[in-house]
Design a protein with these regions (language model features):
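Secretory pathway targeting signatures of secreted, lumenal, and periplasmic proteins
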Residues: 1-53
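Sec/Tat-exported extracytoplasmic proteins
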Residues: 13, 55-59, 137-141
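Signature of long, low-cysteine stretches enriched in small and polar/charged residues
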Residues: 19, 49-105
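Short connector loops/turns at beta-strand edges and beta->alpha or beta->beta junctions
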Residues: 25-29, 100-102, 109-113
């Protein structure tokens, strides 16, 4: 798959190519992606279960959760993006799937502890990048 991302982010791949990080060195954030192939019907259900379990962990510590859905039937992209407010380590959690072969879990991670109000503008900046990533994604091989 491929997608657009901010020129100020640095792409870091793992050797097994099941994980990818976009590092934002100037603000010390990262968008971390976990890429899963869906080999059998139960895999989609298992990935959703894992995603919502992690989301629940972060949501319990939050002041609220806002969800945004994105769907592009032509490109077979189905996504939900969760913005989690308050003092959480991962203020954005999202998934992208084609519902048959691919599932990507993503999160915005803060690489430091900070006051939510002081980093809110940076979170909003990177949230726009997450939206662009989701909307520009193509499932073709890289």
């Amino acid at each position: 798959f491929d997608f657009y991302y901010n020129a100020s982010a640095v792409e870091i791949k793992t050797k097994n190519s099941k994980q990818l990080s976009l590092l934002y060195p100037k603000i010390n954030f990262s968008i971390d992606l976990s890429i899963q192939k869906l080999n059998k019907p139960k895999d989609l259900e298992d990935n959703f279960s894992d995603f919502y379990l992690l989301l629940d962990t972060h949501s319990k510590k939050s002041n609220g959760v806002f969800v945004r859905e994105y769907e592009d039937l032509n490109k077979r992209i189905f996504s939900q993006i969760y913005e989690i407010s308050g003092g959480v380590a991962s203020p954005i959690q999202f998934y992208i799937t084609d519902s048959t072969s691919n599932f990507i879990k993503g999160s915005l991670n803060l690489n430091f502890k900070s006051n939510y109000d002081s980093i809110f503008p940076s979170i909003q900046y990177v949230k726009k990048d997450v939206l662009i990533l989701v909307e520009s994604l193509n499932w073709r091989l890289r």
